[in-house]
UniProtKB/Swiss-Prot annotation:
Stated name of the protein: Phospholipase A2 147
Record has Protein transport as a keyword: no
Cofactors (names): Ca(2+)
Record localization: Secreted
Cofactor stoichiometry and binding remark: Binds 1 Ca(2+) ion.
Organism name: Drysdalia coronoides (White-lipped snake)
Length: 146
């Protein structure tokens, strides 16, 4: 085998090992990202909401810093209510569609799927209606969220 082939093979193996250590994104959070894009008509990338204020992103504490952060707190609380019902909101897939007026849940008969879809649609529409303040992205939560 030629040295160049060995290098390519090694690079592929290392890439696969690295990819194997990345946990898969829960399906519902991917869908939620699509709902956000639908609601805001693609005006802001989903990742802008992943580290915003005290509640947008992982965890949450304190008082929301603005209306958008309040949307995230409401969404977090809604997921908490879903968990109390025995649902797994971050893992549930559901049917939805993107219409001219934003996202909607399709005809969902299973209670958990309907509940979680409603949480996500309400939050996505709330995000679209709330102003985005760049100063509240990636804030020091130890100072602002107690």
């Amino acid at each position: 085998m030629y040295p160049a082939h060995l290098l390519v093979l090694l690079a592929v193996c290392v890439s696969l090992l690295g990819a194997a250590s990345v946990p898969p994104q829960p399906l519902n959070l991917v869908q939620f990202g699509y709902l956000i894009q639908c609601a805001n008509h693609g005006s802001r990338a989903t990742w802008h909401y992943m580290d915003y204020g005290c509640y947008c992103g992982a965890g949450g504490s304190g008082t929301p810093v603005d209306d958008l952060d309040r949307c995230c707190k409401i969404h977090d609380d809604c997921y908490g209510d879903a968990e109390k019902k025995g649902c797994s909101p971050k893992m549930l897939a559901y049917d939805y569609y993107c219409g001219e007026n934003g996202p909607y849940c399709k005809n969902i008969k299973k209670e958990c799927q309907r509940f979680v879809c409603d949480c996500d649609v309400k939050a996505a529409k709330c995000f679209a209606g709330a102003p985005y303040n760049d100063a509240n992205w990636n804030i020091d939560t130890t100072k602002h969220c107690q």
